[in-house]
Amino acid sequence: MSRTWRALVAVLTLLLLTGCSAAADALRPDPTWMPQPEGPPPADLPQPPSTEGAPSPGAPGQPGGPEAGTADDPNVVAIGLTLPWGLAVLPDGTALVGERTTGRLLIVQPERAPAKPVMRIPGLDGTGDGGLLGLALSPNYDDDGLVYAYMTTRTDNRVVRFALRGAVTPVLTGIPKGRTGNGGRIAFGSDGMLYVGTGDAGKPALSADRKSLAGKVLRVDTFGRPDRNNPDRSSPVYSLGHGRLAGLCLSGVNQVYTTEPGQGGQDEVNRVEAGRDYGWPGGTRAGAAAPDREIPAAVGGLSGCAIIERGLFVTSTTGRRLYALPLDGSGQPGSPADYLVGAYGRLRTVVAAPDGALWLTTSNKDGAGKPTPQDDRVIRIMPPAGSTNSPA
């Protein structure tokens, strides 16, 4: 973060604190809020999230402006895609988006324009909930131009890497696959290690099996070798007891968060610690960690997650909304506020860009949604005011 941005955030935070009767109001949902389009920021001046309290006339969902989610909504930057799942923001401000079942990778502009196909991943099995899943840029992308992807093949789930339009090279193979529970989120931490979220492959008992790569968070280097700081330095397993793991993201201090279905009709947000067991299946094993935050599955279907400042953003498929959870000084997630309820249908992925924008994908053509003629879509918004600051 630049010094200019830090100064702006400090001033704006002070204004928010002095203008509110209670610090907890910082994340209270504003029923009038709808996303406002923001163009790409200047390359030499990163811009913080907007602090305007309400949209101006003419913004989506306001009098005189287009309704959010309609053909005229300027926050929708790409349309007509087939189950966009993985997304990574490139250094030039565009986004690389992967289609789960087709294996296509496309470049999406930060303003409405046709998505440009660049390559197709070979050897893909897109049946069930498998296919081309998470994407992440190499920590040395400016030098090596490598993209990492989690994919399902006929025999396994695996992590691969490639340069755009280049050959695909396996990095980590042998992750169990299934009709469901393929997992598939990946992210690099500030330690340069690759964190891989895997599902239980439809076999819940694998999640508790320390010898299986299913139902785990894995931590490996850029070549797929176990991090020597893992609980077992010979194993890629970082944590276990995860079920149909749907989201994985990291904070700037390398705190790992996951989102996943839980027990008893609740979805979970977990703050993951090395070596911990997160209880799937059953949640009653001795020593199993309790969820850090639960959200009823009826308005959950939690999927991707992303972090900006002190706000944790989580997409919801079943609930068709975006959740924002404040993070306190220890990284503990607080009570969720919900946004974009029903505006774009089932939301699958959310990624935070360096300019403070959130990129999201919809999943309305997966058989469980109600697709519009524009689906599936990629959306780019600025977070609502106050959602990136934790209450004092």
Predicted regions and their residues:
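Sec-dependent N-terminal signal peptides
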Residues: 8-14
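Surface-exposed loop and turn segments in beta-propeller and other repeat-based domains
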Residues: 116-128, 168-182, 220-240, 274-298, ...
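Short edge-strand/loop segments of extracellular domains
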Residues: 152-154, 256, 263-267, 271-277
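Repeat-solenoid scaffold signature
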Residues: 237-264
